[in-house]
């Protein structure tokens, strides 16, 4: 290669992503065939070659138009062939040059060039620019960790302004476009100004990076170690090309959304929340709130159901297997099944089981679920006084949660569970709201298809749910709420029912739990009856179950201790196991008594006899009532007393008896409060007997309310009262005529052992109760 009309011919080496300034010495790795041949040609001539940068890095075989026209003439100082076929070259930049013409393009590029001479500028201007450039470069080095401090020392020794600009530019991480601009600028002052502007921008960027770094550092110091680790993990994932944690989480939730059976409105809601979540940093507290909300919507059943088992015989078997008696609620469930089988679209009933503790209300609801083949959910409402417990909290509150209804549906996993609202009569209200009012929507079949929970902010359909509520009393349930439920009363178990429950359910279960087979423990009928009568007094069977467990524990101790291999419990040996009887029941009088009548009472624990005693004392007409009587019972005594005064002469009683005598009415067991109107005819009969001296038949028990005109009004609890009369040894029952229809509710064995006298007036009561009829002046 040589000179031609003031121009120089040189081989061309196109550079990718690299630019060489004059005076620069650096290594290059050359791998392209054309480039290797250009190097070989340079070594044949005078070791000179033109280094020019191609515009696009990714082009393997660039054309002349894709190579910058200005480059640097360099001297090849050393060549080393590497094992992989590439050549490592040590080059030194000499001078700027411009490509005038491409002389050869086939085997390698040969170009005609002209050298570019630097244009001088005003010395003072250049000197000022050089100083400013050095100052800015020094600040840049302090801020940047990419340039070593030793570089500043070597740069400060450079006196030529053009070389200074080239050396500083070579140490800056500039874009290729900016580097090429500096290379193409031959005017020294312009080159310094361009570089100063670029360096100033770089320094400002580094200042901003430093401020951001300090701010991030302070923020990281205030947060937990977990934040720092997550940031590191995020940076690592970014470097590896992985998706960051938040995006991966959102993608996972979107995949879950595709498979969800939620309605379109719910899917749209979830998608909107996902868009919000996507824009939030992984450490955002709001992000975790949104994630919890989305998880709640996913967890709720929207269409999943369990198929009802509509086999009535199967349902009847399951209900009878789990519970003895309880005919009314069982019958209602079977009716629902029958209608469901015919219609196949009936909404679930809303039942309210009312009765004393321990009669099986809660366990019956569980049995209903088993009979229907549905999921069972129970929530206790006892003591709940916050409306948010039912409807949930709005998501703006910290720690917000859905209400118990929605949580119960999540737990069920289906849209048609049996949902038990236990102890609905124990709801309370205060300044936080009235939960009973919130339940109005839940328990209304015409409204609960759009139940609104504050947390999920969307309506939820409860029409397929079978709601069952339980209560001990209806008195505390608000009227609008009670109106929405079908009330089924469950009275306390009779003695006979308890005996059957003990024999068929409780004792076998306790024997199994205590590892006692029939060959190890046997309890006869008399012992069971004694256990029911004298060791428990309750409407339900919870204490009876405990006493059965007590018997099993005592028997287990005897057997394990080696005293006996088999324990037989009789009425006599029961006391040895459980101690003295804890309760006693009233018994019939042993002989006919004057002024003493056996009444019949009903309590939450069942029926019992109630003796009423009357004494006539000399005095001035004072009426004394003792035995801890309630207001209603006192009024009944006064009504009976007034009625007897009005008819005293007809029964042979001194019309002036109330002026000459004090009358004392006493009901024994004074420590026990007593109230109610049903002892009215009992007290009236006792008064007539005491005033006439005619005894009352010992086998008679009675119940009924009395009026001032002697009429007998109906009462409640006849079944339990007659059971207690039978237990006490009574054989005759006097009852109001209006209660005659209730006789059929009494167990047949008891009904056949008793003689019933329905009455409408006190005269009829006296006719059946006294040993002889009082005789006086008839009007």
Swiss-Prot record:
InterPro entries: AAA+_ATPase, ATPase_AAA_core, Lon_bac, Lon_bac/euk-typ, Lon_lid, Lon_proteolytic, Lon_Prtase, Lon_prtase_N. Its EC number is 3.4.21.53. Pfam families: AAA, Lon_C, Lon_lid, LON_substr_bdg. SMART domains: AAA, LON. Residues 10-203 form the Lon N-terminal domain. Homohexamer. Organized in a ring with a central cavity. Induction: By heat shock. ATP-dependent serine protease that mediates the selective degradation of mutant and abnormal proteins as well as certain short-lived regulatory proteins. Required for cellular homeostasis and for survival from DNA damage and developmental changes induced by stress. Degrades polypeptides processively to yield small peptide fragments that are 5 to 10 amino acids long. Binds to DNA in a double-stranded, site-specific manner. It is found in: Cytoplasm. The keyword Hydrolase applies. This is Lon protease. Keywords: ATP-binding, Cytoplasm, Hydrolase, Nucleotide-binding, Protease, Serine protease, Stress response.
């Amino acid at each position: 290669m040589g000179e031609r009309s003031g121009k120089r011919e040189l081989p061309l080496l196109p550079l990718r992503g690299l630019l060489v300034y004059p005076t620069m010495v650096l290594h290059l790795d050359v791998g392209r065939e054309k480039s290797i041949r250009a190097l070989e040609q340079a070594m044949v001539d005078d070791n000179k070659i033109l280094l020019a940068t191609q515009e696009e890095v990714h082009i393997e075989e660039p054309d002349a138009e894709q190579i910058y026209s200005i480059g640097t003439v360099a001297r090849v100082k050393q060549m080393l062939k590497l094992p992989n076929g590439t050549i490592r070259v040590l080059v030194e930049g000499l001078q700027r040059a411009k490509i005038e013409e491409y002389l050869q393009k086939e085997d390698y590029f040969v170009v005609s060039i002209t050298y570019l001479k630097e244009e001088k500028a005003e010395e003072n201007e250049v000197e000022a620019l050089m100083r400013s450039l050095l100052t800015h470069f020094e600040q840049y080095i302090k801020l940047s960790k990419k340039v070593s401090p030793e570089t500043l020392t070597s740069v400060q020794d450079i006196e030529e302004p053009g070389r200074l600009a080239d050396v500083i530019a070579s140490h800056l991480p500039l874009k290729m476009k900016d580097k090429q601009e500096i290379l193409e600028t031959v005017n020294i002052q312009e080159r310094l100004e361009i570089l100063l502007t670029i360096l100033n921008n770089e320094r400002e960027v580094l200042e901003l990076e430093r401020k951001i770094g300090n701010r991030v550092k302070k923020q990281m110091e205030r947060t937990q170690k977990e934040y720092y680790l997550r940031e590191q993990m995020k940076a690592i994932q970014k470097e590896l090309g992985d998706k960051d944690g938040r995006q991966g989480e959102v993608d996972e939730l979107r995949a879950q959304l595709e498979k969800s059976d939620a309605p379109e409105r719910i899917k749209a809601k979830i998608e909107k929340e996902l868009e919000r979540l996507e824009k939030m940093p992984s450490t955002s507290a709001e992000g975790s709130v949104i994630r919890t909300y989305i998880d709640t919507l996913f967890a709720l059943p929207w269409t999943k159901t369990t198929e009802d088992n509509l086999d009535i015989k199967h349902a009847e078997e399951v209900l009878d297997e789990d519970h003895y008696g309880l005919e009314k609620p069982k019958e209602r469930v079977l009716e629902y099944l029958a209608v469901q089988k015919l219609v196949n679209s009936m909404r679930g009933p809303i039942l309210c089981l009312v009765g004393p503790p321990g009669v099986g209300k809660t366990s019956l609801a569980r049995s209903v679920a088993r009979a229907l083949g549905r999921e069972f959910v129970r929530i206790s409402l006892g003591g709940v006084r916050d409306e948010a417990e039912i409807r949930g909290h709005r998501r703006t509150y910290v720690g917000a949660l859905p209400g118990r209804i929605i949580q119960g549906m999540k737990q069920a996993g289906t849209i048609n569970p049996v949902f038990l609202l236990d102890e609905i009569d124990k709801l309370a209200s205060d300044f936080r709201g009235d939960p009973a009012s919130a339940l109005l929507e839940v328990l209304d079949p015409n409204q609960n298809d759009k139940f609104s929970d504050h947390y999920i902010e969307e309506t939820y359909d409860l029409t397929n749910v079978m709601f069952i509520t339980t209560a001990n009393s209806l008195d505390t349930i608000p009227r609008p709420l009670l109106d929405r439920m079908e009330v089924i009363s469950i009275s306390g178990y009779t003695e006979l029912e308890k005996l059957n429950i003990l024999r068929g359910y409780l004792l076998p279960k306790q024997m199994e739990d205590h590892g006692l087979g029939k060959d190890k423990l046997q309890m006869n009928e008399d012992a069971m009856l004694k256990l029911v009568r004298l060791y428990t007094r309750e409407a339900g069977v919870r204490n009876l179950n405990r006493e059965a467990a007590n018997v099993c524990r005592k028997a287990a101790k005897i057997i394990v201790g080696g005293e006996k291999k088999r324990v037989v419990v009789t009425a006599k040996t029961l006391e040895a196991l459980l101690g003295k009887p804890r309760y006693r029941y009233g018994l019939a009088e042993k002989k006919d008594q004057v002024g003493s009548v056996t009444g019949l009472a009903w309590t939450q624990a069942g029926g019992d006899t109630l003796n009423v005693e009357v004494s006539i004392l000399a005095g001035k007409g004072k009426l004394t009532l003792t035995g801890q009587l309630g207001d209603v019972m006192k009024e009944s005594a006064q009504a009976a007393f007034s009625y007897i005064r009005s008819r005293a002469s007809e029964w042979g009683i001194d019309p002036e008896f109330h002026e000459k005598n004090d009358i004392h009415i006493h009901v024994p067991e004074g420590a026990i409060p007593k109230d109610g109107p049903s002892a009215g005819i009992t007290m009236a009969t006792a008064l007539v007997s005491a005033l006439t001296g005619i005894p009352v038949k010992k086998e008679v028990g009675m119940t009924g309310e009395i009026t001032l005109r002697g009429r007998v009004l109906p009462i409640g609890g006849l079944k339990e009262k007659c059971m207690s009369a039978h237990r006490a040894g009574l054989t005759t029952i006097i009852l109001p005529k209006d209660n005659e229809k209730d006789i059929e509710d009494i167990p047949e064995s008891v009904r056949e052992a008793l003689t019933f006298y329905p009455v409408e007036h006190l005269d009829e009561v006296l006719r059946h109760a006294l040993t002889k009829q009082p005789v006086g002046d008839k009007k």
